[in-house]
């Protein structure tokens, strides 16, 4: 029985042949996996590493330039490399788990990571999504890797040397290694993690070599342990010695499993009998097929490279945390229960970031994937009792909100099916009523929120205003899901009331959101430029706009649309001043806003990323068109410093993808995308259902960024929004672009997007 079915190469290639013909380039060739890797603790230009993987693969591989345990695994400005590491790290702030590495040396045996590290140069390094190669200058060795979802092949090319070593490092915090010399094989496991796992967590691995080695030894910490071939200790590894002639190649076929060594052996069958080059070409074809879901024409080389580098980033997380047993059954190790369970599981994702654009992009371009993710969320709830607001691989105490409600509602309302939606509704109801075992699970401060309509500033629950605003939006998404599921009127009334709780924090004096005490008075003193405190990684200027579902209601509080537009303008006008006293230091998010020179607009972090599109609600869409293009031009480039803050599991990249297409999902849970303007002359969305959305803007240029006219399927279209359901039927959108804004288009009441308050007023007439 074949367990892993791989499409014939000809079929995979067919998916992107049209793209190749129109651009004379394959999309994967435009991807720079090093984009965002020039980052450090103090300043993030993405905080990424080159993830050598297949789309949403269980394992990533990356060159390791940092010492063991350092969250900045790969830094572009580093000069030495000490291993090629299997990683599952979603963020340097979250950390890694189950990691181990392979490396090659010559001459004297060096075990310690920093001592064995070799000089390398980017001039002798190649990074593609499906392939990585580096020349290890100190050892005259070329190391290469190409992956499948759960396995990979290494190719090491050695010089002439009687002491050519292959090192397998199982890392510290508890590991195991065994050399099976007669089979040219090494097995082992790593228990290293950054929390979020059950006590019995292990990542089992198998390394199968294609030729015998002269000698094999195991080590503990930094010392060889003589006369044994099997070792379990804090930090173990294996050193395999080969006697090589110049040009000799050693292949290592590697696979891992969170279930067992036997399952790792089974996962190794993903490679089949393919050679290194065949696996590499199949990986290339898979990436080309995936990236060709969106075809773009026109634009500069940098714009094309930025677009596909960003699209690559949206196709990494959340990772598949499931495996396939010998009968073809889907199963997973539960990081919550420590048991082997049936069904899908996905992990390494922070919903505070990704509910905004990543999951809406899935609903548009990858709905069947998102249905599996929803099934995985059912499994998480069944196994842990909670939804995974930040999972890596299990629950992590990071960020705020209960934004799983948004992800669940948006998926179901946009057509995802095939999983237990009633179980997920039960889960979001539980979230709305209970605080969880971690602040990021359930709702911290929920008893105050449900009783008072806000979380008080003075009850020692940090980031109280941010939590209140996000809970109110999440309650609106629960309301929409409840309507779709025909829930009792009592529930509809409850969430209709709660979704308006944002109003309780609006300060008419400053026209900003402000922390409020339990007695109903506003916090004093109040500095709208103060980061943290009542807000999360931002200030009041950033969080005031977090009323995704009722922008008109927010505008009414500010005195109407004109005053609302003036407040939006002010974000770019006020200088990038800040108060960092809450953190007692200038955190990297503050520094990234400061150096961007866009006023107090902080695109490098998520809370304000939708703000530009709110001009459409104020009947001034041309300002959105200006600032969206400005942000794409200034905050992104396809280089190691290519982002303006943390990339965050695809979120900052997904903003660029949507914005380049010409619209953005301001309010997941609604049916509407809000218009910006397309970046390219032509964009084709190849929808999963076989339909196409063709977006044409033939006059598009650096100067012509403003929409003059627009047609939808050949008919004049003046609205500032597009319907998801209409796009899913296939559509042609044609934009006439110009150098000056058209201040008449998109200004009528019927042109403005959905807001909860508008609908309520219409219902009450």
Residue ranges and their predicted role:
Residues 474:
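ATP-dependent phospho-/nucleotidyl transfer catalytic cores
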Residues 21-359, 363-406, 412-469, 477, ...:
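Accessory carbohydrate-recognition regions in carbohydrate-active enzymes
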Residues 1-23, 765:
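Bacterial Sec-dependent N-terminal signal peptides
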